[in-house]
Amino acid sequence: MGCLLILLLTLICFSLRLCLATDVITFSSEFRDSETVVSNHSTFRFGFFSPVNSTGRYAGIWFNNIPVQTVVWVANSNSPINDSSGMVSISKEGNLVVMDGRGQVHWSTNVLVPVAANTFYARLLNTGNLVLLGTTNTGDEILWESFEHPQNIYLPTMSLATDTKTGRSLKLRSWKSPFDPSPGRYSAGLIPLPFPELVVWKDDLLMWRSGPWNGQYFIGLPNMDYRINLFELTLSSDNRGSVSMSYAGNTLLYHFLLDSEGSVFQRDWNVAIQEWKTWLKVPSTKCDTYATCGQFASCRFNPGSTPPCMCIRGFKPQSYAEWNNGNWTQGCVRKAPLQCESRDNNDGSRKSDGFVRVQKMKVPHNPQRSGANEQDCPESCLKNCSCTAYSFDRGIGCLLWSGNLMDMQEFSGTGVVFYIRLADSEFKKRTNRSIVITVTLLVGAFLFAGTVVLALWKIAKHREKNRNTRLLNERMEALSSNDVGAILVNQYKLKELPLFEFQVLAVATNNFSITNKLGQGGFGAVYKGRLQEGLDIAVKRLSRTSGQGVEEFVNEVVVISKLQHRNLVRLLGFCIEGEERMLVYEFMPENCLDAYLFDPVKQRLLDWKTRFNIIDGICRGLMYLHRDSRLKIIHRDLKASNILLDENLNPKISDFGLARIFQGNEDEVSTVRVVGTYGYMAPEYAMGGLFSEKSDVFSLGVILLEIVSGRRNSSFYNDGQNPNLSAYAWKLWNTGEDIALVDPVIFEECFENEIRRCVHVGLLCVQDHANDRPSVATVIWMLSSENSNLPEPKQPAFIPRRGTSEVESSGQSDPRASINNVSLTKITGR
């Protein structure tokens, strides 16, 4: 009798615990159409809904706190309920079911279970995963989960997977239309062999492919390393037919969406403008569609230019008539057969085939793996008569292609270097033409004796160029001798970035015309340019008298080349020619933040929502540098003039010449010479040369106060009572007049609490002691958590003014407080 009583009490307590939980469905606690279940952290909600322009009722999961209803999973997608009589419950067999008022089952988890039905319950997890659990003697066991049945949205911690041995396949499936969640014609998933690759199908027809996975990103999509890094994507493969992929976003709102038209979107929620923001869309152009140009042809998308398809060198259209009519699907054929295929070359005297090099490519479909190293990769292709091309990727190794080359695309930005096999005769034609040109030039040279003097002068310049190149190599070797420098040189090779010729950049910038000049910094001028293919660029031309040496130049190149994030400016390449040193960036059409923020006219274009979005973007870019990138980066020169704005006024952190990389066991670095900009430097850095993550947080706090107030920090230079903006904000805070700090342009009562919170967080960031300042991750949480209680700020650091010989900088936002120089650093352990 006692044992029976204990068992009864146990069941009562278990049932009571589940009934009190709002994220649980039990055998006795079903919910009806008007009711919902909410996950523990209120991120997701499970209930009934009707799509736009539809009267059918579906049981589904959606984001809970997003005003735009965004459904991530639907139970009865194939069988809507025609009225509001629906209910979700645990059946007597132990399955989670969706039924209508007549008891007809419209959907079921449909699992076979060996235990009693009253020990089953369903729970909506904080990840958006709906799970069916059974309680046994050993604890709760997951019997079914919605993440194992993905639909059109791919959430953090979900997996896409394919196993050819077991037949298991987890892939996205589009809705039939935006108003009909039943399965559509498009799906997206992974193919495991010969290399893991992300693909989109229309029915069974391949529509788009990402290119092979190289261990860090998919190499067939421009900027995929930048996009995917936002999500900490991981992919595992056994190279025998099994592959799986998952990712982790900064928040659970990040996701991928496969829409009913077959496009994959990467989205996250923009709090400032209250809408979904799209960061990536594939396919996005006609060239992205699989095999648009057919075999042996490359597609290059340029708005307004036709045709997008071009036969690669050594090939011609298979049908000129079809090609000229815009039908490129037949592709191209060789002009001359390969030597190993020629029937006229069996005497052993034939010349070997060669390779033509093409850059910035999406590699063709269906590569094969070779065990050859980088030096032997070309020979391994030449030894195989069926091999038509090769490429080498450091993450994959040697890649070989046989037969027709399909789905090639030329990018304007990043891409793979690719080598296509051609007959020796194709190179002879070029050689003959070169001989004619050379003879003509020599004859002309004899007619102009004065060119001898010019040639001698060029020889002298060439020696000077060699000296500078040798100096660069010596600096690279010196950089490698440092532990941190070795990481830079080994992991981020300069040769992996495009090397621009000086003449190309001179033409692009109209010979560095004053009309193309965007601005002037301490290290040189920045010019707008346009490359021949139509891509707008920004060229930072370092002054010959600049304080930025080779080490800083190399530092900026190697640091920013692989640190790619939507809130960091992207480096496209560089130029080293003679004494010229230039950096080529993506062009930011709206210039820098201070050009808007401190201009009486332009600042009116920055309303509060826009300014908050800028604050959020700066924080997320800094979060990536400090925590989410493969190496911890301290910027050291964060200021409004180093925040660039794109066409939508989204911020991008720039100018990494003074940035420093921390290894895994360091959290603080000591320097013998302080570099940066007065007013943005933390006190421990300005006074003692110590810098860390919290030094950047201090700079972030100053920028935050500048954005809220619309006033430059240095505008208090002649103010005897307030040495800087932080001191002024602190005085207003203590007197309860902090709202007086706010720029009148942005103040509206509906935003007052949010603006006050930003002032509060800004003061927390500029506190005197580094340990008192929050991390960037905490700053992001503080800014987005409306109901959280923030700690009271302590007095900011009021740094005494110093002369320019003591405080040095990479820019010239205030000529009284910044000049340029080189920083020597030493590492300090924890």
UniProtKB/Swiss-Prot annotation:
<feature type="modified residue" description="Phosphoserine">
    <location>
        <position position="805"/>
    </location>
</feature>
<dbReference type="InterPro" id="IPR003609">
    <property type="entry name" value="Pan_app"/>
</dbReference>
<feature type="glycosylation site" description="N-linked (GlcNAc...) asparagine">
    <location>
        <position position="432"/>
    </location>
</feature>
<dbReference type="GO" id="GO:0005516">
    <property type="term" value="F:calmodulin binding"/>
</dbReference>
<feature type="domain" description="Protein kinase">
    <location>
        <begin position="512"/>
        <end position="798"/>
    </location>
</feature>
<dbReference type="InterPro" id="IPR001245">
    <property type="entry name" value="Ser-Thr/Tyr_kinase_cat_dom"/>
</dbReference>
<feature type="modified residue" description="Phosphothreonine">
    <location>
        <position position="671"/>
    </location>
</feature>
<feature type="disulfide bond">
    <location>
        <begin position="377"/>
        <end position="398"/>
    </location>
</feature>
<keyword id="KW-1015">Disulfide bond</keyword>
<protein>
    <recommendedName>
        <fullName>G-type lectin S-receptor-like serine/threonine-protein kinase SD1-13</fullName>
        <ecNumber>2.7.11.1</ecNumber>
    </recommendedName>
</protein>
<keyword id="KW-0812">Transmembrane</keyword>
<feature type="modified residue" description="Phosphoserine">
    <location>
        <position position="561"/>
    </location>
</feature>
<feature type="disulfide bond">
    <location>
        <begin position="287"/>
        <end position="299"/>
    </location>
</feature>
<keyword id="KW-0547">Nucleotide-binding</keyword>
<feature type="domain" description="PAN">
    <location>
        <begin position="340"/>
        <end position="423"/>
    </location>
</feature>
<comment type="subunit">
    <text>Interacts with PUB9, PUB13 and PUB14. Binds to calmodulin (CaM) in a Ca(2+)-dependent manner.</text>
</comment>
<dbReference type="GO" id="GO:0042742">
    <property type="term" value="P:defense response to bacterium"/>
</dbReference>
<dbReference type="GO" id="GO:0004674">
    <property type="term" value="F:protein serine/threonine kinase activity"/>
</dbReference>
<feature type="modified residue" description="Phosphoserine">
    <location>
        <position position="726"/>
    </location>
</feature>
<keyword id="KW-0472">Membrane</keyword>
<comment type="function">
    <text>Receptor-like serine/threonine-protein kinase that represses the disease resistance signaling pathway triggered in response to bacterial pathogen such as Pseudomonas syringae pv. tomato.</text>
</comment>
<feature type="modified residue" description="Phosphoserine">
    <location>
        <position position="670"/>
    </location>
</feature>
<dbReference type="InterPro" id="IPR001480">
    <property type="entry name" value="Bulb-type_lectin_dom"/>
</dbReference>
<feature type="signal peptide">
    <location>
        <begin position="1"/>
        <end position="21"/>
    </location>
</feature>
<dbReference type="Pfam" id="PF07714">
    <property type="entry name" value="PK_Tyr_Ser-Thr"/>
</dbReference>
<feature type="glycosylation site" description="N-linked (GlcNAc...) asparagine">
    <location>
        <position position="384"/>
    </location>
</feature>
<feature type="modified residue" description="Phosphoserine">
    <location>
        <position position="546"/>
    </location>
</feature>
<dbReference type="InterPro" id="IPR021820">
    <property type="entry name" value="S-locus_recpt_kinase_C"/>
</dbReference>
<keyword id="KW-0430">Lectin</keyword>
<keyword id="KW-1133">Transmembrane helix</keyword>
<keyword id="KW-0418">Kinase</keyword>
<dbReference type="GO" id="GO:0030246">
    <property type="term" value="F:carbohydrate binding"/>
</dbReference>
<dbReference type="GO" id="GO:0005576">
    <property type="term" value="C:extracellular region"/>
</dbReference>
<feature type="region of interest" description="CaM-binding">
    <location>
        <begin position="601"/>
        <end position="618"/>
    </location>
</feature>
<feature type="glycosylation site" description="N-linked (GlcNAc...) asparagine">
    <location>
        <position position="327"/>
    </location>
</feature>
<feature type="glycosylation site" description="N-linked (GlcNAc...) asparagine">
    <location>
        <position position="40"/>
    </location>
</feature>
<keyword id="KW-1003">Cell membrane</keyword>
<feature type="modified residue" description="Phosphoserine">
    <location>
        <position position="810"/>
    </location>
</feature>
<feature type="modified residue" description="Phosphothreonine">
    <location>
        <position position="828"/>
    </location>
</feature>
<feature type="modified residue" description="Phosphoserine">
    <location>
        <position position="641"/>
    </location>
</feature>
<feature type="glycosylation site" description="N-linked (GlcNAc...) asparagine">
    <location>
        <position position="53"/>
    </location>
</feature>
<keyword id="KW-0675">Receptor</keyword>
